[in-house]
From Swiss-Prot:
Residues 354-374, 525-541 have a biased composition (Pro residues). Residues 841-891 form the G-patch domain. There is a cross-link at residues 844, 872 (Glycyl lysine isopeptide (Lys-Gly) (interchain with G-Cter in SUMO2)). Involved in calcium homeostasis, growth and proliferation. It comes from the Eukaryota. Its main location: cytoplasm. Residues 480-501 have a biased composition (Polar residues). The modification Phosphotyrosine is found at residue 714. The gene is CHERP. The modification Phosphothreonine is found at residue 819. InterPro entries: CID_dom, DUF7819, ENTH_VHS, G_patch_dom, Surp, SWAP/Surp_sf. This is Calcium homeostasis endoplasmic reticulum protein. One of its GO terms (molecular function) is RNA binding. It comes from Homo sapiens (Human).
Amino acid sequence: MEMPLPPDDQELRNVIDKLAQFVARNGPEFEKMTMEKQKDNPKFSFLFGGEFYSYYKCKLALEQQQLICKQQTPELEPAATMPPLPQPPLAPAAPIPPAQGAPSMDELIQQSQWNLQQQEQHLLALRQEQVTAAVAHAVEQQMQKLLEETQLDMNEFDNLLQPIIDTCTKDAISAGKNWMFSNAKSPPHCELMAGHLRNRITADGAHFELRLHLIYLINDVLHHCQRKQARELLAALQKVVVPIYCTSFLAVEEDKQQKIARLLQLWEKNGYFDDSIIQQLQSPALGLGQYQATLINEYSSVVQPVQLAFQQQIQTLKTQHEEFVTSLAQQQQQQQQQQQQLQMPQMEAEVKATPPPPAPPPAPAPAPAIPPTTQPDDSKPPIQMPGSSEYEAPGGVQDPAAAGPRGPGPHDQIPPNKPPWFDQPHPVAPWGQQQPPEQPPYPHHQGGPPHCPPWNNSHEGMWGEQRGDPGWNGQRDAPWNNQPDAAWNSQFEGPWNSQHEQPPWGGGQREPPFRMQRPPHFRGPFPPHQQHPQFNQPPHPHNFNRFPPRFMQDDFPPRHPFERPPYPHRFDYPQGDFPAEMGPPHHHPGHRMPHPGINEHPPWAGPQHPDFGPPPHGFNGQPPHMRRQGPPHINHDDPSLVPNVPYFDLPAGLMAPLVKLEDHEYKPLDPKDIRLPPPMPPSERLLAAVEAFYSPPSHDRPRNSEGWEQNGLYEFFRAKMRARRRKGQEKRNSGPSRSRSRSKSRGRSSSRSNSRSSKSSGSYSRSRSRSCSRSYSRSRSRSRSRSRSSRSRSRSQSRSRSKSYSPGRRRRSRSRSPTPPSSAGLGSNSAPPIPDSRLGEENKGHQMLVKMGWSGSGGLGAKEQGIQDPIKGGDVRDKWDQYKGVGVALDDPYENYRRNKSYSFIARMKARDECK
């Protein structure tokens, strides 16, 4: 392929060369971005099929080829220093794949194909524009020719059309119609007038009133053409009515289209046009397209040269694309030939240097250097295991368990200082089949099972992401030998580290490079690798990483407490049972003693709930029988519960334990008091609440307009109101004169005598001191006789009888002689639980209010601004307060101040009257 000539302008040449280099390095996405940004820049017309497009494509191909060669050259150099591999001498050499980041041949071909398509689309758009411009120019020339033939004054016609456009009166339309009929002397005259109307209506800047009023003029002319039999003018209007009507109809909205459509109905009714024209007018888009095609055929002599020029450009682009593809194929073939020529001497030398394969030894080597091979169908290469020197016991002490007799099989290849379960591949049963349970998993090793059950399949890459770290080589010997290991003890006693780089089963260690084997009861493929949940980060709105409750319950056996949970799947199950074929691990001095009830279900979980997720961040790694059941109090000194990120990065739900139920006013929280939740299983109530939250709305659980449950927080607000009342009651009872005043007086508040006393009628019984005296008298009346109690109550409550408007008293019972639910001692200072005075959901009024949109969580009213408790039946109010509405505060400070001032004023007036 010959190199096209570069542009003479050095600046433009530099732009093309630099862009070719950038596109070769960054890929076709960079070219797309450049085309979008520089689509209006004339300097970048070469990207859209303009001049020097061929030079740009050739330059781009050369840059890509040079980049591939530069990246392949360093790969060929170290190949000579590699150790010889036992390959067949005549095996064909595979082509060297392109370096990472360099586009392959298929990518280059696809990029060229995409460029070709973009160029074709751009050229087609340019062709359409040029064809339209050529047709418009031809039409204008035709109009000029008719104007020269007829010698009509179009300025006079425009002067008559302007009043029609402005006012559209009958006189203006009549004047325009008369001028047209008076000048319709020949077909050229008629064509000139009709063409002038078409140009005025189809112009780009024409507004709707101009088009509509001129169409009204055409309608009037058509009517008179039919009456006067003016066939020449009618034929001229038939040629231009399609673009006039279709353009006006498609350029306006629907309400304005109806005005134009009425004219079409009138034309169809009167029969001004034939059926073909009526069909085009009924489908404006189709009719306009047919009209444009007619113009192209009519002016084909002007259109064909434009179309041929663009067709040649498109064909040139296709030819360049084909040549580019052919050039790439040839270059690839040449590279393969050169590669074969370079590798032939090397392969011959390898064949000569390769010794004959030795006979298979009778016994395997004690420490093989080559990693164990996997099954032939494994798609991944086996993971390189550490050498045997890394697993020697410290101090030269050998594992006494390894000296025992071993059975035949793969265990014979294991050195005596390595546990047999460490890197021994286990046979994997096909999917859908379980391994036979006759053989115990560890028949020849005296130690317990590993902390992580070995999995051996093609999914070991999930656990092999961090094995390149040097930290893997620092593992100690297996903890089930007789040598205590302090580092292993930290795996059970040290809390999990919050950093995601460290696995959750070690204080600072990483997972040993076990051969991972899929669980025997797992029936499906493994999900992608997932990290453990980050509880020190804001949570996702919905955790879809966990399976729903009781998912595949019968397919997973329970696990032993010392086993690591199947971390990639985020499954967790009751951690009490251990499979029957695998006993509990042998005791080791570095381990905790197993609980006596290790084979029993823990008290907080059973086999019915295998949906417990992984323990939260901060779990200290203890087995479940060493943990308490639902710790009622959080140990704030526990370092595993202290978050190590700023408080604003934590989930908002961690603030909930710091807000007490009785708190109702703003109280700033101390970020140092925030603690992570302790490990505890979800309760039945929590699981039921989660299921109810995601359940669809029903009649019992309606939703509001925003999609939330209507009464979802009713119980919470109800409990919060109870706690708030209880706190207020305790504050009132904790005073020096009322320490025992309200303890048992509620039960007797309704059974007092109804006697009155005239002595207290003139006293100010509504003050706060009067309320205190009543409380004091009632508290003392419990330890006296009934008559004295009655006398004390009658003296202190002569006007209020048995009621008080103090905040602690909420509602009077209907019964005349209620009794307290429980009788504590006379010296008891604990207040009895205050019964809830709010109406329950069984109340008809409550149900009616809920149906009308009341949420039920606050006060009455649309904005919940009213009272929250039912109206008290017998509240005694002052004379000026008795007619106030429901929900009006009676302890308004301004009203109280005005009332106190009025007392002094009335007293002065009475004193003045008495002096007179």
